[in-house]
Amino acid sequence: MNRIYLYLLIVLILAGCSSPGGRYDMSDDQAPDTPLSVEHIEDAHPQYEPYSFGGNKDYNLRGKSYRIIKNPKGFTESGKASWYGKKFHGHLTSNGEIYDMYSMTAAHKTLPIPSYVKVTNTDNGKSTVVRVNDRGPFHDGRIIDLSYAAAYKIGVVQAGTANVRIEVITVDKPTKPRPKSKNNALEYVIQVVSSQHIERVRTLAQNLGQNLSAPSFVESTNNTHRLFLGPFTDDDLTQTLLEQVKSAGYDSAFIKTINKRAK
């Protein structure tokens, strides 16, 4: 029951900028009303993740067949990138996560979900790293659909589309658990989100911490406010909480190792 409540809570928070009502109330996609500052946006952090149960089967759409790439290691592709934003914000992606136009994510027609991809805008040389968690774009010549934040960061929003090169970043499955210090000098934290809206981050920190029964704190640097859960000393517990956070819609969350804080 707590899990259902947490899921609904995150949906409401993430959908704060989307229009009310049924699915895809907007006939045309558009950027958010408030211009985005990209200084605080971090690239997706590549890490090993098992492929999702949803969104990874071969499929047919509009008379075309699409086969999911089984071994994406070394995969590269060049073509047009587009972006999607407010119309889809707060709705489900192909693997059941919640689309957040402010996260560093993307859609691809055949890469396994999730995959991490370096995207380089060959028109201006800017690049970023995104996490693929959706399917698309289904327009001839387009190879990847970027979240609004990712597109803005490399200059795709302004032009609508751009020439890009994508390269898959492969992270092998860990064969050993995370090393532990002899003196237990290391701890783990989960970075959930970063934002310039301090009150929103504080509210989320309180709600998420309560619903996951986990300590939370906010660190602020240069008007960028980062929400963390932790610190934890147990690696298995940290991994379990990370999966819960991602299931709640924060697919860009990741684990950081820190030196133990003085009591």
Swiss-Prot record:
One GO process term, biological-process aspect: peptidoglycan metabolic process
Which segments constitute the SPOR domain? 182-257
**Entry similarity comment:** Belongs to the RlpA family.
**Signal peptide annotation:** 1-16
Protein role: Lytic transglycosylase with a strong preference for naked glycan strands that lack stem peptides.
Q: What is the protein named?
A: Endolytic peptidoglycan transglycosylase RlpA
Question: How does the record classify its membrane topology?
Answer: Lipid-anchor
SUPFAM superfamilies xref list = Barwin-like endoglucanases (SSF50685), Sporulation related repeat (SSF110997)
UniProt-listed InterPro entries: RlpA, RlpA-like_DPBB, RlpA-like_sf, RplA, SPOR-like_dom, SPOR-like_sf
Give the gene name: rlpA
Molecular function GO labels: lytic endotransglycosylase activity; peptidoglycan binding
* Classification via PANTHER family: ENDOLYTIC PEPTIDOGLYCAN TRANSGLYCOSYLASE RLPA
EC number, UniProt record: 4.2.2.-
**Which Gene Ontology CC terms are recorded?**
cell outer membrane; plasma membrane
Write out the annotated subcellular location: Cell membrane
Lipid modification (N-palmitoyl cysteine) maps to C17
Organism encoding this protein: Vibrio cholerae serotype O1 (strain ATCC 39315 / El Tor Inaba N16961)
Lipid-substituted positions (S-diacylglycerol cysteine): C17
Question: Which keywords describe this protein according to UniProt?
Answer: Cell membrane, Cell wall biogenesis/degradation, Lipoprotein, Lyase, Membrane, Palmitate, Signal
